[in-house]
Structure formats: structure tokens, C-alpha cells
């Protein structure tokens, strides 16, 4: 007898889930939902506390729970978890993985509202961090459209300005930053508005398309906004930045005024040292060498007290220059030696050849021509990567020192001294009387004596001759004499050009950035994420900032490299000087 076909065997209908089972599943889902909410809140709190990796761990667990629960697959809850996790990845330095998750959250073009603006903004941040700036700009534009009705467009404008800066389009960057400032002012975020406007002025300078009056007008507006803010420490940074802007315009009396306003508002020793150094630079430019000496001495002492060897070395160099202008060439030599040692200790190659050039000039002033030759040769050997004008200046000084040395020992009659094959001669073939030191100035015969450093004297001298012309013409931003290098307080981008010769520097401080998931901005409280379970309104964190840096900042917690400022060795990618504060 054949066995019955299993398909022919009647099956009992599967029992429908009992009401008790439904209740169990519902309770289980409610527990999972509560866990997702708790993990999301914990992740958000960790971000606010700067604990990025703990935040990432919480968002990962929330995303896994949402992925496993059948009720949340392909739902807004899962999308929100993907969004938060993606933003956290961007925040912690993994923009590629973050971008994948952010796109999974489906930031729809047709959707409107702040939440969708946040989605677009974080996608833009990821592209920005990956260096895909055109894509980043497109998503910032999209975020801007979502934010406009909500009044949140300031951050999007600010980040667009950063992109345009990185693309080498300072004019567009200036426009975006001015729009950002206006938006922040409308939102009563006076701190962010003032900083954005200060950054816009820097971009205007860099573009070279604006007259001095236009830039000054923007700087003054930034000052007025800052004065309405109650954040006193911010005011210190901003006044320092204003001083930098005035210095770039060669409006040194206004720069001194701004730096003096910054000084009592900067309480951290490193920040105070930065402002003091800037004050010294501005007074050097004005020819107030006694005041400059006092400020540079205080700056060097303060930088040394907090272990800022790089900055201390530059302060010693500026102090030596002021001393040389006061005629104290022995003290100038001693401080150039301090500057040289500090530059060697901190790996500051530019500072080393600058100090050697100053030592050569000081030795020549003291009649120690063998020492002068030694230091000029050392400076020339160390500046091979500098512009041609630097090497040409050193060659001229070296040639003039050789000629002066020969005249001094009586080997050659000064009036018959001429060039010979393989012999260096000062430009123009000028000569000087035996044993007679050359006068400080611009004559070719006295090149090595123009200043004890070979930088500020000739550069500021030529700069002052051009000042009247520059005030009536567009402001050029290019390498050349007459413009001191700027020093920034950490957190700022130096908008000055690279100088052809070795100028001392004004300085800028750079602020540390905190973190909040979602939108990030240079001037604003920073990024925010749409955290679906954290209650109304995304929290923001307040973090001081100065100018827009090159490149993206993934979220508020990402630390930007400190560029071209008065900083310690590890944070010195750009060669610049007037100093910024962090």
C-alpha cells in the first residue's frame, strides 16, 4: 500500500497569534524603542561633552537595534538612526562611511523643513571632509533652501564661504561670509555675525578687488557687532583679528588701538603673548622701537613660560630688530642668538635663516665682518626654498660684506675694487671707503647694514613709501615689501600673503572646537543632528572661533589644523606672521 502524498494530508490551520503574543511583541518593541531613544540621547550627550567615540558607540547600537526590529525596517526611525550614525562617523573622521549612511537616510530634494536641511547639511559636510568641494557646495545650497524658511541659513552660508576659500575664490567666499553674518545678526547670534564679517574682510583683502575704505567699513561693522556681544573672551579674539586686518591695510595706528583693546580681554598667557607680539610688530612698523622692544620682551617671556618655543623664537627675532633700530647692536646680536636657538629647538627652518641673517647684520654693524660672512652664508644655505628675492638680497649682503672686509684689511684699494670672475659684488658696483661702515638705508653699498635683521627695516621702509598709493588704489594681496607677516591666535586662517623676505610676524590664536551632531559652522555654534528622540529643538554647543580655515570641519568637534599662526611646532603649516588667538 503506497504511502499517502504529504500534500494530500489535510493540514491543521496554524493558530493565529493570541492576543497575549501580540501584547508580548508590542511590549518587546516598546522596550526596543525605549532603548533606541536612550542610546540616541546618550550619543547626543556624549557629543556635547566632546566624547566622540562614546557617542559613536551609542549611535551604532541604536542603529543595530533599529535594523533588527521588523517594525523599524525602512521606516523614519531607521532613517533617523542612519542619519545620526552617519553624522557621528563624519564627526569622528570617517566621512566616507558617514556619507554612505547619510545618503541612506534619503535626504529628499522635495522635502522641506529644518530636519531635511540638517540631512542635506551633513551630506555636504561629508563631501567637504572628503575634499569634493563642488558636491559639498551643491548640498550646502540644498540645505540653504530648506533652512531659509526656518531662519537657519547662517551656518550654510558660512560653510559655503569655507568651500570657496578652499577653491581659491576669495571674492565668492567674501560674499557668502557677508550673507552668513547678516543671517546670524537676524538670528541674534552676534558672536557668529561678528566673526563671519571679520572673515569676510580677510577674503576681501585676499581677492585684491576692494578698496581700503570698503574693507575698513566691513571691519568697523564687525567691531560694532562684537561690542554688542556679552562674550568678553570672544571680544579679545575679535579685536586681535581687527588689528590683523588693519595691519594688512597698513593702518598701523588703528591696528595698535585694536590690539590694545584685545589685550585685557585675553586672559590665557599664550593669548596675551600673541597680542603683545602683535603690538610689538605694529609699533615696529610705526617706528616706535622703544614701545616695540617692551612688548616683544613681554611676549618672549610669556611664550617661554608656557613652553611655546616656536613663538618665543619669533618674538626674540622681533625684539632683536627693535634693539637694532635703537642702536643697541650687542643686545640685538644676543637676542638673534636666542632666536636662532629657539628656531633650532622647534624645527623652525624659516626662523633659523632669518636669525642668521639678523646675526650677520648685527655682526657687520659691530665690525665683525668674518662673523657676518659666516652667518650670511649660513642663511643663504638654509633659504634655498624661499623666493628668489630672498636669496638675491642675501647674495647682495654677502657680496657687500666681502667687499667691505677686503677694504678693511687693505687688500684692495676701495676706489679700484671691481668685479672679477667668481667674485661676488654688490649690485651697481658701488664701493665704500676703507674702514667706513655703510649707512643704514637702501644704498647698495650698505646692504648688509640696512637693518640688523634684513627684514623689517627694508620692508617697512618701502611699505611706507607705497602706503599713500595703496590707500587710493585697490588693496593688493601679494608677496612683496611693506607687509609684515601676521600672527594669529589659534583657530584662525591667515589671509595674508607669503612675504618674499623674512618678516617677523603678527599672531593669531585658534579656538578648540566642541561637537554637536549635525550642522557645523566656523562661526556658529556648530553642527547639529536631527535627533528624533531628544525632544524639541536640537541643542547647540557654543565654541569660539576666528576665521574660516581651509578645508572642512566635519562637525563641531573636529579640530581644524592651526594654520599660519603663532603656534607651536606641530601646528605650523603656513608661513605667516601677525598673530591670531585661539
From Swiss-Prot:
<feature type="repeat" description="TPR 3">
    <location>
        <begin position="117"/>
        <end position="150"/>
    </location>
</feature>
<feature type="repeat" description="TPR 4">
    <location>
        <begin position="154"/>
        <end position="187"/>
    </location>
</feature>
<keyword id="KW-0802">TPR repeat</keyword>
<dbReference type="InterPro" id="IPR024812">
    <property type="entry name" value="TPR_24"/>
</dbReference>
<feature type="repeat" description="TPR 1">
    <location>
        <begin position="36"/>
        <end position="69"/>
    </location>
</feature>
<feature type="compositionally biased region" description="Polar residues">
    <location>
        <begin position="441"/>
        <end position="454"/>
    </location>
</feature>
<feature type="compositionally biased region" description="Basic and acidic residues">
    <location>
        <begin position="462"/>
        <end position="472"/>
    </location>
</feature>
<keyword id="KW-0677">Repeat</keyword>
<dbReference type="InterPro" id="IPR011990">
    <property type="entry name" value="TPR-like_helical_dom_sf"/>
</dbReference>
<feature type="region of interest" description="Disordered">
    <location>
        <begin position="548"/>
        <end position="582"/>
    </location>
</feature>
<dbReference type="InterPro" id="IPR019734">
    <property type="entry name" value="TPR_rpt"/>
</dbReference>
<feature type="region of interest" description="Disordered">
    <location>
        <begin position="418"/>
        <end position="481"/>
    </location>
</feature>
<feature type="repeat" description="TPR 6">
    <location>
        <begin position="273"/>
        <end position="306"/>
    </location>
</feature>
<feature type="repeat" description="TPR 7">
    <location>
        <begin position="313"/>
        <end position="346"/>
    </location>
</feature>
<feature type="region of interest" description="Disordered">
    <location>
        <begin position="1"/>
        <end position="31"/>
    </location>
</feature>
<feature type="repeat" description="TPR 2">
    <location>
        <begin position="79"/>
        <end position="112"/>
    </location>
</feature>
<protein>
    <recommendedName>
        <fullName>Tetratricopeptide repeat protein 24</fullName>
    </recommendedName>
</protein>
<feature type="repeat" description="TPR 5">
    <location>
        <begin position="236"/>
        <end position="271"/>
    </location>
</feature>
<feature type="repeat" description="TPR 8">
    <location>
        <begin position="353"/>
        <end position="386"/>
    </location>
</feature>
<dbReference type="Pfam" id="PF13424">
    <property type="entry name" value="TPR_12"/>
</dbReference>
<dbReference type="Pfam" id="PF13176">
    <property type="entry name" value="TPR_7"/>
</dbReference>
Amino acid at each position: 500500500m503506497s504511502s499517502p502524498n504529504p500534500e494530500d494530508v489535510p493540514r491543521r490551520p496554524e493558530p493565529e497569534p493570541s492576543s497575549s503574543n501580540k501584547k508580548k511583541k508590542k511590549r518587546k518593541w516598546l522596550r526596543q524603542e525605549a532603548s533606541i531613544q536612550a542610546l540616541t540621547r546618550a550619543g547626543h550627550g556624549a557629543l556635547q561633552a566632546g566624547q566622540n567615540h562614546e557617542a559613536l558607540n551609542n549611535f551604532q547600537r541604536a542603529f543595530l537595534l533599529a535594523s533588527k526590529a521588523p517594525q523599524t525596517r525602512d521606516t523614519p526611525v531607521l532613517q533617523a538612526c542612519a542619519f545620526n550614525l552617519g553624522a557621528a562617523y563624519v564627526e569622528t573622521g570617517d566621512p566616507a562611511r558617514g556619507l554612505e549612511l547619510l545618503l541612506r537616510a534619503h535626504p529628499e530634494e522635495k522635502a522641506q523643513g529644518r530636519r531635511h536641511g540638517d540631512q542635506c547639511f551633513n551630506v555636504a559636510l561629508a563631501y567637504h571632509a572628503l575634499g569634493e568641494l563642488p558636491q559639498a557646495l551643491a548640498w550646502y545650497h540644498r540645505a540653504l533652501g530648506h533652512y531659509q524658511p526656518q531662519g537657519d541659513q547662517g551656518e550654510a552660508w558660512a560653510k559655503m564661504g569655507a568651500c570657496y576659500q578652499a577653491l581659491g575664490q576669495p571674492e565668492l567666499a567674501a560674499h557668502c561670509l557677508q550673507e552668513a553674518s547678516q543671517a546670524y545678526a537676524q538670528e541674534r547670534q552676534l558672536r557668529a555675525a561678528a566673526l563671519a564679517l571679520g572673515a569676510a574682510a580677510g577674503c576681501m583683502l585676499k581677492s585684491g578687488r576692494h578698496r581700503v575704505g570698503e574693507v575698513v567699513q566691513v571691519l568697523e561693522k564687525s567691531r560694532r557687532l562684537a561690542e554688542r556681544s556679552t562674550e568678553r573672551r570672544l571680544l579679545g579674539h575679535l579685536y586681535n583679528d581687527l588689528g590683523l586686518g588693519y595691519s594688512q591695510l597698513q593702518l598701523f595706528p588703528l591696528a595698535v588701538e585694536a590690539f590694545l583693546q584685545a589685550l585685557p580681554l585675553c586672559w590665557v598667557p599664550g593669548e596675551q603673548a600673541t597680542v603683545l607680539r602683535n603690538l610689538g610688530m605694529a609699533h615696529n612698523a610705526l617706528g616706535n622701537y622703544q614701545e616695540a622692544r617692551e612688548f616683544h620682551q613681554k611676549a618672549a617671556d610669556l611664550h617661554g613660560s608656557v613652553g611655546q618655543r616656536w613663538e618665543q623664537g619669533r618674538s626674540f627675532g622681533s625684539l632683536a630688530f627693535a634693539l637694532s633700530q635703537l642702536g643697541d647692536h650687542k643686545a640685538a646680536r644676543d637676542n638673534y642668538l636666542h632666536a636662532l636657538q629657539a628656531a633650532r629647538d622647534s624645527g623652525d627652518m624659516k626662523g633659523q635663516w632669518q636669525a642668521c641673517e639678523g646675526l650677520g647684520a648685527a655682526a657687520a654693524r659691530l665690525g665683525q665682518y668674518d662673523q657676518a660672512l659666516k652667518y650670511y652664508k649660513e642663511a643663504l644655505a638654509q633659504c634655498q626654498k624661499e623666493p628668489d628675492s630672498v636669496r638675491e638680497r642675501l647674495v647682495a649682503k654677502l657680496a657687500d660684506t666681502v667687499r667691505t672686509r677686503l677694504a678693511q684689511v687693505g687688500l684692495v684699494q676701495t676706489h679700484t675694487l671691481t668685479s672679477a670672475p667668481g667674485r661676488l659684488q654688490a649690485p651697481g658696483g658701488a664701493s665704500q671707503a676703507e674702514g667706513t661702515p655703510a649707512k643704514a638705508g637702501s644704498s647698495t653699498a650698505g646692504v648688509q647694514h640696512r637693518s640688523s635683521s634684513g627684514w623689517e627695516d627694508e620692508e617697512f621702509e618701502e611699505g611706507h613709501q607705497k602706503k599713500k598709493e595703496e590707500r587710493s588704489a585697490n588693496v593688493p594681496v601679494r608677496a612683496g615689501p611693506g607687509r609684515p607677516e601676521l600672527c594669529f591666535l589659534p583657530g584662525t586662517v591667515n589671509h595674508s600673503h607669503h612675504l618674499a623676505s623674512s618678516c617677523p610676524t603678527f599672531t593669531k590664536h585658534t579656538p578648540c572646537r566642541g561637537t554637536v551632531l549635525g550642522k557645523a559652522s566656523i562661526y556658529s555654534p556648530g553642527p547639529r543632528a536631527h535627533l528624533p528622540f531628544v525632544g524639541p529643538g536640537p541643542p547647540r554647543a557654543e565654541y569660539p572661533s576666528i576665521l574660516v580655515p581651509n578645508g572642512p570641519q566635519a562637525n563641531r568637534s573636529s579640530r581644524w589644523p592651526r594654520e599660519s599662526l603663532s603656534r607651536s611646532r606641530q601646528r605650523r603649516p603656513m608661513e605667516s606672521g601677525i598673530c591670531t588667538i585661539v
